[in-house]
Design a protein with these regions (language model features):
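Clamp-loader machinery-focused feature within the broader ASCE/P-loop NTPase space
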Residues: 1-133
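Conserved catalytic/switch belt of AAA+ P-loop NTPases
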Residues: 111, 136-153
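A short beta-strand-to-loop transition that corresponds to the Sensor-1 phosphate-sensing loop
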Residues: 125-127, 153-156
Length: 156
């Protein structure tokens, strides 16, 4: 497992929030953004990835379990799903914050219609790792989101 957060199929102890989200998704009553807050290791990223997989799989189920062998899971795990983007600090290039160029790429991402016809989804990991310029650039799209866009962002 390269990234346990992306690949986990278990989300223990959070049945209420998952049931709430599942009902919202299945009733097609999603908000455009969800802020997840809590201590590190609580499951914020796991929840965001589970929701993303379920929404992009575009199948109604009784739970949000999407098997890791399904196409949508493989595309998300390999960061190659055309309707999904993650903003996070670039550790490989020793960046300590989410850069403005990443936010610009995200805005451009949302300027195109979804490839598979459903939602375009962005996970922002983590909002408190953005500089002021990145935050301000992101604010515009959060205030006036394109149709069928969805953001999950979390803070510690």
């Amino acid at each position: 497992m390269d990234n346990p957060v992306k690949e986990t199929s278990n989300f223990i102890g959070n049945n209420n929030i998952e049931e709430f989200m599942l009902n919202s998704i299945n009733a097609n009553k999603l908000h455009h953004a969800y802020l997840l807050s809590g201590i590190k290791g609580l499951g914020k990223a796991t929840f965001a990835y589970r929701c993303t997989k379920y929404i992009l799989a575009d199948t109604l189920k009784k739970n949000m379990n999407v098997d890791n062998s399904e196409k949508v899971s493989k595309l998300i795990e390999s960061d190659s799903h055309p309707d999904f983007i993650v903003l996070k600090k670039d550790i490989e290039n020793e960046k300590s914050l989410i850069e403005i160029d990443q936010v610009r790429d995200c805005i451009n991402f949302f300027n195109h219609t979804p490839i598979f016809g459903g939602y375009k989804i962005c996970i922002i990991d983590s909002l408190d790792e953005m500089n002021i310029n990145s935050t301000n650039a992101l604010l515009k799209i959060l205030e006036e989101p394109p149709q069928n866009s969805l953001f999950f962002y979390y803070i510690s």
